[in-house]
Amino acid sequence: SPGHWFYKEWIRKAAERNMLYLHFTMDDNLSLDEKIKARYEGMYSGVFYDRYIRGLWTVAEGLIYTMFNKDYHVVPSVPRDYEEYLISCDYGTLNPTSAGLWGLCEGKWYRVREYYYNGRKERYQRTDEEHYAAIEELAGDLSIRKIIVDPSAASFIEVIRRHDRFMVEQASNRVLDGIRDVATQLNAGDIFFCDCCTDCIREFGLYRWDEKAAEDRPLKTDDHAMDDTRYFVRAAFQPSRFSF
């Protein structure tokens, strides 16, 4: 980000500090062959492409997931031969609680269905037990490998453990890494969203960067399904998929 202290204090002041500033792009890395460079170019778009491929200090602005395409990423809610299932959950009290059931089919992950409850809109705050009952309904009689939950939701995690049906895991809450990883999987065509997941699809069109913030961060609105999607991607895809 151009708001980073190193950019402001050193790169922008290179002349007055009597320093030589050289700009490099990925193409300047002679250790990368064309096949690897093509793969990396396909992994990123938007601000991440400008930063990681073009080597630019680019400000994060506008929609976060500009690569999300309803015509491509949204698919019919039809039966598929899913091989395994995960559930991701972003827990809220007054803010919405969002959970997604994900199924793996032929190497691709699908958000099969979702649970989205807005206590403020409904004017009723559900208890942890009521949210858990909704998760049970979301899972049905499926075998769920694990539930990935917002790490701040300690009381809800304890409720899941006490019922002893699901294995529960605290989600990674490294926001920028998670956003980058979701963008990578959208670009790669590895995650899709069944058209019944209307709240998640709606949030993709609203999730934006906070352009007034000094550092990169999303606006804390319309981000609940986006958060649970981020938790899912960080858990479902191995870290090596994202590392150089």
What is the predicted role of each segment?
Residues 1-43:
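ASCE P-loop NTPase helicase motor core
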Residues 80-104:
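Gly/Thr-rich phosphate-binding beta-strand-loop-beta motif of the actin/hexokinase/Hsp70
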Residues 29-89:
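ATPase catalytic-site recognition across NTP-hydrolyzing enzymes
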Residues 24, 53, 99, 147, ...:
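A residue-level signal for conserved active-site and pocket-lining positions in enzyme catalytic cores
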Residues 19-23, 86, 168:
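Conserved beta-strand scaffold positions in the cores of enzyme catalytic domains, especially
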Residues 100, 105-218, 237-244:
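Mg2+-dependent endonuclease catalytic cores in nucleic-acid-processing enzymes, primarily RNase H-like
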Residues 22-24, 53, 112, 171:
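Hydrophobic residues at beta-strand termini and immediately following loops
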Residues 222-244:
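Charge-patterned, long linear interaction tracts outside catalytic cores
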